[in-house]
Design a protein with these regions (language model features):
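C-terminal functional extensions of proteins
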Residues: 184, 192-245
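Hydrophobic alpha-helical transmembrane segments of small proteolipidic membrane proteins, enriched
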Residues: 1-33, 239-243
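Long, charge-dense
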Residues: 83-85, 89-137
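Membrane-proximal low-complexity regions enriched in glycine and acidic/polar residues
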Residues: 115-171
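Membrane-cytosol interface motif
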Residues: 31-52
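Histidine-anchored nucleotide/phosphate-binding helix
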Residues: 67-88
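Extracytoplasmic/lumenal ectodomains and periplasmic regions of secretory and membrane proteins
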Residues: 150-200
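Gly/Ser/Thr-rich loops at beta-strand to alpha-helix junctions
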Residues: 58-74, 97-101, 156-162
Length: 245
């Protein structure tokens, strides 16, 4: 199994590199995901109205198995920082893991630097609001309610505490775009958010937010590998049906 796993990784890496090269000649077209359309609208309204976005990366530390959603959120954060640098209120980031908080501060600084607005950067906008699930949520709720937030982007590792964040967003009439990998969090998000990101759509955040060609190429590579797996399964079923070992 380890050899098969290594082969899959190498094939995926090769596909991604090849697609990055091909993307220079043609821009890929992805299906529309309503949550990302809503996010783009929220970004524009934030700049026009002089309000701020709230991005929450969850509480998946980098040394835990649940680190991937937070990294996906960081990839999107860089682009959001650049796009909202003209707003009167800089976006604010919350997280429930110390390493994620540090990375969010670094990502904010890099985003403002890329937008030639480094003077806007304030390390206090990358906040560690709590180290346990509900202390993390309790620290983020006052921010949603009291800091002129017009939209919330919740992309990371969440548990049942995500319901507190989406409830606070609803009470302040600030829309939320949310995604998580925990089944309980997914159920709560689906019930409480108008446009949830379902399943693997969470990991498409970087590609859909314009974070770079590598993110778009990786999304295309996932689609190709998915079709390869489907064809292998169908081929195996056909061989089994006709009694071919």
């Amino acid at each position: 199994m380890s050899i098969i796993g290594l082969a899959v990784v190498l094939v995926a890496a090769g596909l991604t590199l090849g697609l990055i090269f091909l993307r220079r000649k043609a821009t890929p077209v992805f299906r529309e995901i309503p949550a990302f359309t809503k996010l783009k609208l929220a970004m524009g309204l934030s700049v026009e109205a002089g309000t701020r976005l709230h991005v929450s990366l969850g509480r998946g530390g980098l040394q835990t198995p649940s680190a991937a959603p937070g990294l996906s959120g960081l990839a999107m954060l860089r682009h959001l920082t650049e796009q909202t640098s003209a707003s009167d209120e800089p976006l604010v980031v919350t997280s429930g893991a110390a390493d994620l908080a540090l990375l969010s501060q670094d990502t904010l600084q890099a985003g403002y630097k890329a937008a030639s607005a480094e003077e806007i950067y304030d390390p206090n906008t990358g906040r560690l609001t709590g180290l346990t699930p509900f202390s993390f949520a309790a620290g983020a709720i006052p921010l949603i309610q009291d800091e002129n937030v017009s939209a919330n982007i919740l992309i990371g590792h969440f548990g049942a505490e995500v319901a507190l964040l989406t409830d606070a967003a609803e009470r302040t009439n600030s829309p939320a775009v949310a995604a998580a990998i925990d089944p309980s969090a997914q159920a709560l998000i689906y019930a409480s958010v108008d446009e949830p990101l379902v399943g693997e759509e969470l990991f498409a955040a970087g590609a859909y937010s314009g974070a770079g060609s590598a993110h778009q190429a990786s999304l295309q590579a996932q689609d190709i590998l998915r079709w390869v797996i489907i064809l292998i399964l169908l081929g195996g079923s056909a061989l089994k049906l006709f009694g071919i070992p």
